[in-house]
Amino acid sequence: MERWEDAAKLRLEMKARGVEKVPASSWVELDGKVHEFHVGDKSHPLSDKIYEKLDELGMEMKIMGYKPTTEVVMFDIEDEEKEHTLVHHSEKIAIAFSLVTTEPGESIRVTKNLRVCSDCHTAIRLISRITNREIIVRDNNRFHCFRDGYCSCNDYW
C-alpha cells in the first residue's frame, strides 16, 4: 500500500511544480497515413472493429493461460478494473487496428512514445503466436521484434 501512497504524493508534487506526465501514445502507418492511438482511445472510425478484435484476442490469450499483470497499473482500484485498463493500452489498440486493416501474414510495425509495460510485452508475444504475425514495436527504449510468441529482447528490456 505504501507504493500507492508514494505514487500519489509524487503525482501531487509533480502537479504543484507544473510537471506534466506525457500521455502514452502509439502509432502505425497505413497507406501513407499515420494513425495515432491513446489509452482507451475510441475516436478512430474503425473503433468498433478494433475493440471487437481486442476482445477476440483477449479470449484467445486467456485460453493460452494469459493472466493480466495488474501490478503495472498505478491506481488503487479493483483488479477487474485494472484488467480493463490494461486491455486498452495504446500499443494493443494500434496492433488490433493493424490486424483489421492489413492482410494476414503482413508484418505489423508500431511506434510508442513510452516504454512498453510488462503486461503489454507478454500480450504482444502471445498475439504474435495467435495471429502468426511478426510484430515490431519501437518503444522509447528499444526495438522489440515479436515472432511466434518470442521477442528479440529475450524478455529483457
Kindly give the residue locations of the regions a language model identified.
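Terminal (and in a subset, N-terminal) low-complexity or junction segments at the ends
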Residues: 1-157
